Regions:
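AAA+/P-loop NTPase substrate/partner-engagement loops
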Residues: 2-46
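Conserved AAA+/SF3 P-loop NTPase catalytic/coupling segment centered on the Walker-B
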Residues: 30-57, 75, 82-93, 109-110
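A short helix-turn-beta junction within AAA+ P-loop NTPase domains corresponding to the substrate/partner-engaging
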Residues: 91-125
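Conserved P-loop NTPase/AAA+ ATPase motor core
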Residues: 242-316
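Helical mechanochemical/support elements of P-loop NTPase systems and associated helical scaffolds
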Residues: 27, 45, 49, 106-110, ...
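Conserved Walker
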Residues: 17-24, 58-75, 98-107
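Conserved AAA+ ATPase small/helical "lid" subdomain
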Residues: 115-205
Length: 316
């Protein structure tokens, strides 16, 4: 009774936000959650919805041209859709937002406002064995519970034990905190939870937001380079980096910060391109350069030239 399902392409500015003729607020002001089904089809009926949705997803407020003025609402937005190819194939050729319509699948301003990407390919598909002939869970009761929980917030729960890494920006920290808060409300409705609970939810929340950011990096390039999301344990000062599982197979370069003295570069012979990993270590001795790991005379000569250049220009 507190959520609404919108079929693909049926959302209009009047039905979702506000009707300028009557001044009546739309679905975002009437429901707790709005789910756009088959969102990989045409998502909205008219173009005006996209900028309105951007404002709403950013601040919870919106304003249509006309007499309605600025209005606020609290409905959550859910985009439900399918990826019709293996995830590995999609990630090799494009990005996970590519199934969206052309109006939004490369609109980084819109996509950056998505706080959470749930990997549907990891979720078990229903089978007859998942259903029972006995008493089931009452969805009416569950919806009332969810509605009642909206008045509580645990967005500051992580601050007791953890801090977020420096690569999480404002648009990253907000959804991460909200996800942790939501999981606490679902799994600890009495408000009692431990550090271990929060850490588990924090890892999951960071992964879901990082999945969004990784796609933005594929679309928008260097603007979204900072995807090494992490959190720091306040007690031990240990920093933990949270990866995105499906990205491991597509990244030749590890997705955690490189250790000092390590870097990657690329070289080409005119026809082919090779990725090179360079590791520099210092050892006790007389300061002589020792090159290992390659038999290429050209590469060794390039390394010696670089080494000699650095020595000649180093500041003492």
């Amino acid at each position: 009774p507190y959520s609404m399902l919108v079929s693909g392409g049926q959302g209009t500015a009047a039905s979702l936000f506000v009707n300028n003729s009557s001044g009546q607020i739309g679905a975002v002001g009437k429901w707790d959650a709005i789910c756009f089904d088959e969102s990989t089809d045409e998502l909205f009926k008219d173009k005006e919805v996209v900028p309105l949705m951007k404002d709403y997803m950013e601040s919870g407020s919106f304003s249509r041209a006309g007499k309605s003025g600025e209005k606020s609402a609290n409905a959550s937005i859910i985009l439900n859709g399918n990826i019709n190819q293996p995830v590995e194939t999609v990630l090799q050729t494009s990005h996970l937002f590519s199934p969206f319509s052309d109006k939004i699948n490369s609109d980084t301003a819109f996509l950056d406002r998505i706080g959470f990407f749930l990997p549907g390919w990891e979720i078990m598909k229903f089978a007859p064995s998942n259903f029972t002939n006995h008493f089931g869970f009452s969805t009416d009761y569950f919806s009332e519970f969810l509605h009642a929980q909206r008045k509580y917030s645990y967005v500051d729960a992580i601050d007791k034990w953890f801090t977020l890494g420096n690569q999480l920006r404002q648009r990253d920290t907000k959804p991460v905190r909200k996800t942790v808060s939501g999981l606490i409300k679902l799994l600890h409705p009495d408000g009692n939870f431990t550090k271990e609970d929060v850490e588990q939810y924090l890892k999951w929340a960071i992964e879901m937001r990082r999945r969004v950011k990784e796609q933005l990096k594929r679309i928008g390039g260097m603007e979204f380079w900072d995807t090494n999301f992490s959190y720091i344990d306040k007690e031990t000062q240990e920093e933990t980096f949270v990866p995105v599982p499906e990205e491991r197979g597509t990244n030749l370069i590890e997705d955690t910060p490189l250790s000092p003295g390590t870097c990657y570069t690329a070289t080409s012979d005119g026809d082919k391109v090779s990725l090179i990993k360079i590791e520099v270590v210092t050892m006790a001795g007389n300061g002589k350069l020792n090159i290992s790991g390659t038999s290429s005379a050209v590469m060794k000569e390039d390394i010696r030239n670089t080494y000699n250049y650095i020595r000649a220009n180093e500041k003492t």
